[in-house]
Design a protein with these regions (language model features):
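Intrinsic disorder and flexible/low-complexity segments
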Residues: 1-107
C-alpha cells in the first residue's frame, strides 16, 4: 500500500500492489462518513504505519492512471491489510479514475 501525489508522506491517493502492478482503490462505499469509511481509514492508515486515524478525501489528487484494483471495499477496521477486507475481486470494478480514493492519516 502506498500514498501518491500528496503533500506529505501521510497524505495522498491510495494505491495497492497486486500481481506486481500498482493500482488504485475506488471510492464506492467509502466516500461518505460511516462505518465503512471508518473501517477503511483504520485499516489503510494502520497498514501504512500510522495511528489509524484520519480522513478519506475523494478529491485534491490527480486521477490515477494505473488499473483500478479494488472496488466496493468493506472493512470492519480490524483487518491487518486492505486485501483482507471484503471487495468485489481484483480488477472487478465499475469506476473511473476520478473516483480514486485518497487518504490522510494522522502521523
Amino acid at each position: 500500500l502506498r500514498l501518491v501525489d500528496g503533500t506529505a508522506r501521510n497524505h495522498g491517493r491510495v494505491e495497492v500492489l497486486h500481481a506486481g502492478v500498482w493500482g488504485t482503490v475506488c471510492d464506492d462505499f467509502i466516500s461518505t462518513s460511516g462505518p465503512r469509511q471508518t473501517g477503511f481509514i483504520s485499516v489503510a492508515c494502520g497498514q501504512l504505519g500510522f495511528s489509524g486515524a484520519g480522513s478519506a478525501p475523494t478529491s485534491g489528487f490527480p486521477d490515477g492512471v494505473d488499473p483500478t484494483w479494488m472496488d466496493d471495499l468493506d472493512c470492519a477496521g480490524t483487518e491487518a491489510s486492505l486485501p483482507m477486507c471484503t471487495f468485489r475481486g481484483w480488477g472487478v470494478e465499475n469506476c473511473a479514475h476520478f473516483e480514486d480514493i485518497g487518504l490522510s492519516c494522522t502521523p
